[in-house]
Amino acid sequence: MNSLLEEGRGHLAGLLEASQRCAWHLCASADRVPWPVTEKELAARSMDLALFEPLAAVNERFGKLQDLLGGAMRHLGVLCGEDTSTFLRVLSFCAKEGIIESVEEWQACRALRNRAAHDYGTNYAATAGHFNALHAQIPVLIGVTLRLAAYAFQTLGIRAEDPRFAEALRSHG
């Protein structure tokens, strides 16, 4: 196998592992939050780092995971010989292969991620709504993480070097 192809395969393996690690850390952070969060609870605990640190981690890791998955999906498309000239084509390929449920679901998740990248301010009702919406979409991203890894292994024989994170994700409630 030529070195460029081998390098590309190694890069995808690294993206898969980074995605699985990030997904596991996202779940671990989310597990530290008493869901659903409410406006009243956020206001009452506004200086409580035991609540706000894991919320900040959920916010950060949700966006990071989507970024990692987007890069991994594009790279998978390249290695599979698909047209990756636009991300919409990448999403269409991934939807066709069952990696994502639908282009629309991914785009809705992405819109939520884009909101997560901005300051959520002091409106506790909006903040609670934002975090509860993120929490509701975590299973979507976990599913994409696992299906992407399964597809890469089944079609290209590529997998993350460390299987522990994928195993932990599969057994996570």
Model regions: which residues?
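Solvent-exposed interaction patches of small proteins and small membrane subunits
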Residues: 1-173
